[in-house]
A protein has these predicted regions:
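Conserved, structured core segments of small domains
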Residues: 1-131
């Protein structure tokens, strides 16, 4: 059975210090990597993200600020949505990211079948009912 994972690409400043030609080369490698994953069915979607956005917080979303405010190394610059056999396979794919040699960071996260907070609440209710 295939499992779903998201690769988050972090550190939006990985291009610093690279020439336009070097950036073009890496982006070409990145595109080829993604197209290969799409053609063999392991990647289902993937997109870069804009560097702008909004951050909503506070009760009832009262605070809306320009963002993201994360450090550049923590900011999410894009994602791939994968369907593969295991976390090990997703990690092996992530290790092939062409941006890693230039400071990009790839985070691999499994997609939950249900909200973890909801699952925790249901487990607590079952435990209390059994007590």
């Amino acid at each position: 059975m295939k499992n779903q994972y998201i690769l988050f690409f972090r550190d939006t400043s990985w291009t610093k210090g690279l020439s336009p030609e070097q950036i073009q080369t890496v982006l070409g490698e990145w595109k080829g990597w993604f197209e290969g994953l799409m053609s063999d069915g392991r990647a289902k979607a993937g997109h870069p993200l804009e560097n702008t956005g909004k951050v909503i917080s506070g009760k009832k979303g009262r605070v809306v600020a320009d963002g993201p405010y994360a450090e550049a190394k923590e900011a999410v610059g894009g994602f791939f949505f994968l369907e593969v056999e295991s976390m090990d396979e997703a990690v092996a794919i992530a290790k092939q990211c062409p941006g890693l040699d230039y400071g990009a960071i790839v985070e691999v996260r499994p997609v939950a079948a249900e909200c973890p907070a909801m699952r925790h609440m249901q487990e607590n209710q079952l435990a209390h009912a059994a007590a």
